[in-house]
Amino acid sequence: MLAVSLHFSPTFMKNKPTLELADLKAVAAAAEAEALKNKWAVTIAIVDDGGHLLWLQRLDGAPPISAHIAPAKANTAAVGRRESRVYEEIINGGRFSFLSAPDLKGLLEGGVPILKDGQCLGAVGVSGVKSNEDAQVARAGIAALGL
């Protein structure tokens, strides 16, 4: 009989920063303020690092479809660890086969990852106005975290 004893030390476990509810509220409030300042009716989505929806806020007048597009942009930015704009540029550059990438649906500008010390905590996706304006709102929200 062979007996094996495994001991796991806490030093093997890594801690990673995560988004707390207070972070979500701060990001959403700052993003909303940016949108309202510019009179933009948008939907704001915040996801965790795995692309799972944590927050969805549709401002008055935002198009119904924006409630589908914003989370998709956020998901793409989180799981891809880069702005969704990068994927739009890849496709616009002629790499149409990238459209077959699994689980990437928000391939338009407006999804921005939330990065801290090189780690992705999640992402913000915004939809409802021009894509560069969506990204502006997302970045304004993330700036509230002071990362």
Where on the chain are the PLM-derived regions?
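Short, Lys/Arg-enriched N-terminal segments with co-localized hydrophobic residues
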Residues: 3-12
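Flexible, solvent-exposed loop/hinge segments and secondary-structure transition points
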Residues: 12-147
